[in-house]
Design a protein with these regions (language model features):
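A short helix->loop->beta-strand "cap" motif at the edges of active sites that frequently abuts
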Residues: 105-106, 159-163
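Polysaccharide-binding and catalytic clefts of secreted carbohydrate-active enzymes
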Residues: 1-148
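Aromatic/acidic polysaccharide-binding cleft in carbohydrate-active enzymes
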Residues: 134-135, 163-166
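Short amphipathic alpha-helices and their capping/turn segments at secondary-structure boundaries
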Residues: 119-122, 152-158
Length: 166
């Protein structure tokens, strides 16, 4: 531990700029996550309602991430993609926190961002020693004070009785 350092902060703005990656490695990881979640392609077809969407799969290798398409995607596939993306980001944060904890006794945090849709903060909060939030209120926006108050209430709930910081 270093003098003057009182806490570690893992990566910044997980899921921002951009939140999604559709590269071949992420596509393979998505299929592996689906295999873990559903066990086989028939359970995936049932969960996703693929008969209705004319997207029935015969092998998990046929499943691609819901990248740009001419129409809207299967909503169940999008939900699982969001869950997968959150899982990947959270796994990265947890790996960074684990490394920090191996070398330091200082608390670990990362910045949440109010109501940020790319991550499930309820799942993330238990992996952190201290919940923290970024806030960038626009002084010209009359609703900004309400948004900051709402985010503070959310952080207090996520902290579960533990301290949290802004």
């Amino acid at each position: 531990d270093l003098a003057g350092v009182f806490m570690w902060h893992t990566g910044n703005w997980y899921g921002g700029h951009p939140a999604d990656c559709f590269c071949p490695a992420c596509a393979r990881a998505f299929r592996a996550w689906l295999a873990e979640r559903y066990g086989d392609v028939e359970r995936l077809n049932a969960a996703w309602g693929t008969d209705f969407w004319s997207q029935r799969y015969t092998d998990l290798e046929q499943v691609a991430p819901p990248a740009a398409m001419p129409t809207f995607p299967n909503p169940a596939q999008m939900l699982d993609w969001r869950r997968f993306s959150d899982h990947q980001l959270r796994s990265l944060m947890e790996a960074e926190a684990r490394i920090l904890r191996e070398h330091s006794n200082l608390p670990v945090t990362t910045n949440f961002m109010g109501d940020f849709p790319a991550t499930d903060y309820w799942r993330w909060a238990d992996s952190l020693d201290i919940v923290s939030d970024d806030s960038y209120p626009d002084p010209a926006d009359p609703a900004a004070a309400h948004e900051v108050a709402w985010a503070g209430d959310l952080m207090r709930g996520l902290a579960g009785g533990r301290p949290w910081i802004l």
